[in-house]
Amino acid sequence: MTRHLIFAAMLLVCLFVCWNAVGARDARSAFSLEETAQDEHVMEERIFINPAGNREKNACLENCRSSPNCENYEFCSK
């Protein structure tokens, strides 16, 4: 009888540990996806918002954003 209780207790402990490990992995994965989305949004803001108020550069960025052939924004910084 005691062996069965010990076995059941060990089984419950193992299940609890495994369940927490799976939950932690899912939480890390969800956090990583959210963090990536936030990083992309921040990078987009850095590209299209010009805090110095340089209107020519902003116009260049807007034109480039609307152009399907534009691959990078390097020429706008010149």
From Swiss-Prot:
Chief location of this protein within or outside the cell: secreted
Signal peptide span: 1-24
Processing after translation: Contains 2 disulfide bonds.
Tissue: Expressed by the venom gland.
GO cellular component term, pick one: extracellular region
Compartments (UniProt record): Secreted
GO molecular function, one term: toxin activity
Protein name (record): U-scoloptoxin(04)-Er1d
Keywords recorded for this protein, A-Z: Disulfide bond, Secreted, Signal, Toxin
Maturation-removed propeptide residues: 25-28
Keyword Heme: no
Protein family (similarity comment): Belongs to the scoloptoxin-04 family.
Lineage: Eukaryota, Metazoa, Ecdysozoa, Arthropoda, Myriapoda
